[in-house]
Amino acid sequence: MVLSDADKTHVKAIWGKVGGHAGAYAAEALARTFLSFPTTKTYFPHFDLSPGSAQIQGHGKKVADALSQAVAHLDDLPGTLSKLSDLHAHKLRVDPVNFKLLSHCLIVTLAAHLSKDLTPEVHASMDKFFASVATVLTSKYR
């Protein structure tokens, strides 16, 4: 999925508003994912999956850091996320549908915290951004 210039502007603007909350928002989105889609828990058998746990917070920071890198390199998502794609495809073997589920929960979390900023246009751009990230992360599954 190709991000337009307007999409890139929207993604950078909303991610700028996320700011220092990125890790917390990503952790909240992970907790939402695990609660709403219990099958996603199978990849984390060693985690305390209760909302707010140190492990959820830690993994949320990893997700947020990866997304922040993606936002900073919107014109080179494949290069930016290549190592992460290798990890998820070859070592972790995460079912690709889980990226879509997490993306949905990330949008819900953004809406909960930044409702005034998540206009329909920004929402559409973030959907495209998360879909682009998911496409890159699953590109090495083939």
Curated annotation (Swiss-Prot):
Protein's name according to its UniProt entry: Hemoglobin subunit alpha
Lineage: superkingdom: Eukaryota
GO terms under cellular component: blood microparticle; haptoglobin-hemoglobin complex; hemoglobin complex
Modified residues (Phosphoserine): S4, S36, S50, S103, S125, S132, S139
InterPro entries per the UniProt record, alphabetical: Globin, Globin-like_sf, Globin/Proto, Hemoglobin_a-typ, Hemoglobin_oxygen_transport, Hemoglobin_pi
Binding site for heme b: H88
Annotated positions of the Phosphothreonine modification: T9, T109, T135, T138
Tissue specificity of this protein: Red blood cells.
Functional note: Involved in oxygen transport from the lung to the various peripheral tissues.
GO molecular function: haptoglobin binding; heme binding; iron ion binding; organic acid binding; oxygen binding; oxygen carrier activity; peroxidase activity
Keywords: Acetylation, Heme, Iron, Metal-binding, Oxygen transport, Phosphoprotein, Transport
Subunit structure and binding partners: Heterotetramer of two alpha chains and two beta chains.
Amino acids binding O2: H59
Naturally occurring in which organism (per UniProt): Dasyurus viverrinus (Eastern quoll)
Biological classification of the source: Eukaryota, Metazoa, Chordata, Craniata, Vertebrata
Globin domain ranges (all copies): 2-142
Phosphotyrosine modifications at: Y25
TM annotation in the entry: none
PTM sites of type N6-acetyllysine: K17
GO aspect biological process, one term: hydrogen peroxide catabolic process
Family, per entry: Belongs to the globin family.
N6-succinyllysine: modified positions: K8, K12, K17, K41
